[in-house]
Amino acid sequence: MVGSDIGIDLGTASILVYIKGKGVVLKEPSVVAFDRDTNKIKAIGEEARLMLGRTPGNIVAVRPLRQGVISDYTVTEKMIKHFIQKALGKKSFRKPLVSVCVPSGVTEVEKKAVEDATFAAGARDVKIIEEPIAAAIGSGIDISKPCGNMIVDIGGGTSDIAVISLGGSVVSTSIKIAGDDFDEAIVRYMRKKHNLLIGERTAEDIKIKIGTCYPLAQPETIEVRGRNLVTGLPRTITVSSEETEEALREATLQIVEAVHSVLEKTPPELAADVADRGIVLTGGGSLLRGLEELIEEKTGINTMTAEQPMTCVAIGTGKYVEFLAGKRDEEF
């Protein structure tokens, strides 16, 4: 059986495309810019991201996926089509078999919307896979074994936490707190603490450069430019990593609580496996400094980040059909 032609990690923040034999061939922001007057799409991906917060009145840059689900069907369909064509190149005549991952908490209606949009974008066949399963496969875990593995996948819009055994999720939860919420928490903090208005991109920059959710041995600082809410004029201030820890405390503790609640519901044998094997973090949000230490401190379980956290889900999505094929062969 030929494996999946394409695996798509349809993320709120980024879209990654995996092609069998080639690996991850595309990673772009899930942003679309279109002209409000003509309804024509002006840019997709990185080009559109650069327009966020900087567009004239008639051009709007939007994220068609919110918290892991489709918020704008037509735009999502066009975006998927664009990325499939870009990944395969113009020479591809055969419609691809596409597997797409969705957060574990989505409804059947939301799954169907993803499936329909992918078919409409030109897929020959579509397989839907839950994010924690894809993340586990992509991080190199053999999910077919009768052994408990815990995955915490922190994306842009959702965090998926699951204990996986024998190819499926035994206990899972999906919370709408993730990387985007880290950015929003920083925006709110800057407004409240410093009377400074900053945009999403600046907040993301602060998070990447000095963001932490656990005390650093050596605190760091960064210069931040924004608009003073009192005078209305541009202003530059110095922000420390300790302030980001304060800003991110509420969001990160909600993720820790979700991990805790999944562990509480896990059957004892599988919980013992997790205690033995540790917790694996995947997704772009897992790159936030201090997250490993915070989860480890609060659960008492060894916590580690996967080797390629950003691409785990895309790789696992692409390899999922091969996993299913292997399972089918075993049954016959």
Label for each model-derived stretch:
Residues 1-154, 162-280, 286-332:
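Nucleotide/phosphate-binding catalytic cleft detector across ATP-hydrolyzing
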